[in-house]
Amino acid sequence: ADLSAGELLTFFRGKKASPLEAAKDVLARIADLNDDVNVFRLIDEVGTLEDAKQSERRWFKGEPLGLVDGIPVSVKDVLLTKGWSTLWGSKLTSPDQPWDEDAPPVARLREYGAVFVGKTNTSEFHWKTVTDSPLTGITRNPWNPELTPGGSCGGAAVAVATGMGPLALGTDGRGSIRVPCSFTGVFGLKPTF
């Protein structure tokens, strides 16, 4: 669970680790730490393990789909993800509306074999630079739980900082990736569309 995406790819290529092992390690880390820092609103253990098994088969055949094949990835809970609800950190949205399509960045990662783990917490409608919401409560900074991890991608940054996955997908209009990354000591990029 402490390996970077690049290290995992090297291990997959060398058959020193498999996508299924990586997924199981990430899920175990989530089970150990999520209650303490409140990162995930949704964890899809069954889907994660199934996607990891499919990725493992591709790697064993020497046919990975791309540079993220088998890499565990979390998704900020504002990005549409096929089969999952997207609640925007709010009680105003219905949890009974799983989407039948992916947002473009989710679709691109899925096309290249990413293993999606779950949805990370965000501030309500990702509108402030702390990660708390009436839906999920407060996400804690992993290095000092009395401090904020920043926002609105605080859940994503804490997931990466604590080894609950090497990659997290977020959004950034006014610092929503950059602020949490600086508060938790991880690297983040403001994406373009």
Where are these regions (language model features)?
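Short glycine/serine-rich loop segments
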Residues: 99-193
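Enzymes and membrane/adaptor proteins characterized by extended Gly/Ser/Thr/Asp/Glu-rich
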Residues: 67-105
